[in-house]
Amino acid sequence: MEARIILLRIQIPWSANRQFSHPPLDFPRFIRASSSSTSQKPKTYEGPKPRKNLVADFISKNDDLVRSLPIYVGGASLLAVLFNRTVSGIAPVADASSSQSRADLLALGLAVTNLLTGLVWLSIRPKSITPVNPKGVECKVVESDLPASMVSELLWAWESLKVATCCKSLVIVYNGICLIQIGMVAESPEDKKTVIVKTDKLMQGSVYRGVMKSKAQSYLANLSLYPGRSELPFLPANTQAVILQPLGDKGIAVIGGNTIRGFTSSDQAWISSIGEKLDATLGRYFVDSDEISRVTV
């Protein structure tokens, strides 16, 4: 009430000549929104665009021409030197006291070097590395005694490897039991059935014992070059690369890929992290199982 009385007592002086400021004419007073499709522009990427390397693009598209270019340059240089000696009237026999002869000999040496370089470039070509289709059959074998949580954990590991890497086959052996065999597997030539993992034979092999002894990840970047290939008969015949990841002291994960040197350093680190997680989960499960079996006995 007191506040109202105070406001009523305040008198604002009124002047008839007072001028009120008007907004500038160019100031937009109204903003209209239109929902018509013609006024909407398609959204495009407006950030920095990657620069194109024109030289690299030209070389990749004209590989044969670039490799044979030193031959053309060397041949043209050789013909130019011979034509110069013929036209200039210099004796065809090289004279050590003549500066022209010494320059021609140097030019001939460079021309021959270009010719040899071109021949080497044409004869030596890098082998293109492309993914292959594994020769085998799809397989999904999971240990029946595992609880649903463990099966979900193993399937998560498989999906993670399949999506993020070139993994096409996965075998996990822990505590002497093959917990899961999933992905592409070899096919038996006799009965056309899948080749199941034989844990006893695998654990007796030098590959398994070497990994468990070193307790470190083993990366076979080109599987065909390693004699231990015969110890992994359950993998497809054309498996290109294999990673052997130890799972603590009691297990191993065999990961097969379809590309030579297809597993990058980040893939190997990711596989190591998955291996540590699986080792912790499987270790707790088997410890609990042993305690339960002891109590029941």
UniProtKB/Swiss-Prot annotation:
Pfam families: CCB2_CCB4. It is found in: Plastid, Chloroplast thylakoid membrane. The chain crosses the membrane at residues 71-91, 104-124. One of its GO terms (biological process) is cytochrome b6f complex assembly. Residues 34-70, 125-297 are stromal. Residues 92-103 are lumenal. The keyword Magnesium does not apply. Keywords: Chloroplast, Membrane, Plastid, Thylakoid, Transit peptide, Transmembrane, Transmembrane helix. It comes from the Eukaryota. GO terms for cellular component: chloroplast; chloroplast thylakoid membrane. Disruption phenotype: Seedling lethal when grown on soil. On agar plates supplied with sucrose, seedlings grow very slowly with a chlorotic phenotype. Deficiency in the accumulation of the subunits of the cytochrome b6f complex and lack of covalent heme binding to cytochrome b6. Residues 1-33 form a transit peptide. It is a multi-pass membrane protein. Required for the biogenesis and accumulation of native cytochrome b6 in the thylakoid membrane. Controls the conversion of apocytochrome b6 to holocytochrome b6. Required for covalent binding of the c-type heme to cytochrome b6. This is Protein COFACTOR ASSEMBLY OF COMPLEX C SUBUNIT B CCB4, chloroplastic. It comes from Arabidopsis thaliana (Mouse-ear cress). The gene is CCB4.
